Amino acid sequence: MATGEAMHLLLDTGHATWGGASPAALARRYHDRISHFHAKDVRPDVRRRSDSEGWSFLDSVLAGVYTVPGDGLIDYVRVLRELQGYSGWIVVEAEQDPKKAEPATYAKLGHANLSRFVKEAGLG
């Protein structure tokens, strides 16, 4: 079993934010161990309602707490600057109800936003 430095990590910006962590700080601290990157954002209005009304994680997801990069509160330029030299895949995620958020529309939005953030971060 791999442990310590031999263990690679998946950086999931949405889950990190949901759990109270800073995705940029995680990217900085574990840069050399990150081998996968799931990019999703958190809608602050849904998160506030979830917190104030005591929703479960599943209820929050079903209510649309997650969205594509650039449609929420995460500073992707900051995260990407911490990932200088990363050469793995970046997976755009949203974990949204397709009846509420049309998948092709949000996939295009996430790709466009992430492409812009990559340029703003000086990576492309």
Locate each region found by the language model:
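Histidine-acidic metal/acid-base catalytic patches
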Residues: 2-11, 15-124
